[in-house]
Curated annotation (Swiss-Prot):
It comes from Streptococcus pyogenes serotype M3 (strain ATCC BAA-595 / MGAS315). Binds 1 Mg(2+) ion per subunit. This is Putative ribose-phosphate pyrophosphokinase 2. Its cofactor is Mg(2+). PROSITE patterns: PRPP_SYNTHASE. Belongs to the ribose-phosphate pyrophosphokinase family. Class I subfamily. NCBIfam families: PRK01259.1, PRK02458.1, ribP_PPkin. D-ribose 5-phosphate binds at residues 225, 229-233. Its main location: cytoplasm. ATP binds at residues 43-45, 102-103. Keywords: ATP-binding, Cytoplasm, Kinase, Magnesium, Metal-binding, Nucleotide biosynthesis, Nucleotide-binding, Transferase. The gene is prs2.
Amino acid sequence: MTERYADKQIKLFSLTSNLPIAEKIAKAAGIPLGKMSSRQFSDGEIMINIEETVRGDDIYIIQSTSFPVNDNLWELLIMIDACQRASANTVNIVLPYFGYSRQDRVAKPREPITAKLVANMLTKAGIDRVVTLDLHAVQVQGFFDIPVDNLFTVPLFAERYSKLGLSGSDVVVVSPKNSGIKRARSLAEYLDSPIAIIDYAQDDSEREQGYIIGDVSGKKAILIDDILNTGKTFAEAAKILERSGATDTYAVASHGLFAGGAAEVLETAPIKEIIVTDSVKTKNRVPENVTYLSASDLIAEAIIRIHERRPLSPLFSYQPKGKNNA
């Protein structure tokens, strides 16, 4: 969408974590970003001021709770409170990246379930709906007692790889860990390609001892994961694929954090191209072979469909050309 959206009762606001994607979402939706200010005092306290009326409006607040996670989360909570006190009709949050979603279960004795805690805090603050992108664990949706729309990036990736000609039996989609099989299978189905899995000890020091379940010899491999953090998982997986006879290795992830020297790790790995979405704005150095694929159109369309009470199901698939549309 390029024209101004007709219904002025809907308003978008961007907080400070990822202004670039917010601007793209606003442009795609045809809704200008609302006027507000956010500043941090010398002691770390956050002050927000909404500089226009929101009374009776449906508000969508765009904020990735990425690094610095706690500052961005608190900024979001304070903005929610400000909208509630200003008599907004509904307050909806758009989280391109949902921090703390990896802490979704008790993996060891006496561990918290922080994703549930964050869900409780956001709900208590007064939100009506969550729109997010590729949750690390889909069960996090169940931590909320309000609607949660978890948009998928796999259709975006499938369209990209199809246009590059990376599909069919000479391509294999690889999950770098056994917990990502469902994601790999989803992309593989779009590309009409087989899948493979790398299984290895979870200890970082033993990653290079991983082994492949499936056939990658003589094939172009696409590694897929949801979060690219330090880059070690992709880097070691790419080395294993190279040793196992893969001709080229590509990598794709929904969220590119690039933390802890990830650029240095990935630049020495045999990976031809890394694709991530723009869900996270990072200050860390990014490898030169990274391509950003914007999720802004997808999120903008979801916002408009929600506001117009239309189904989101058309956003959850990609129909490659030449396939039967029946």
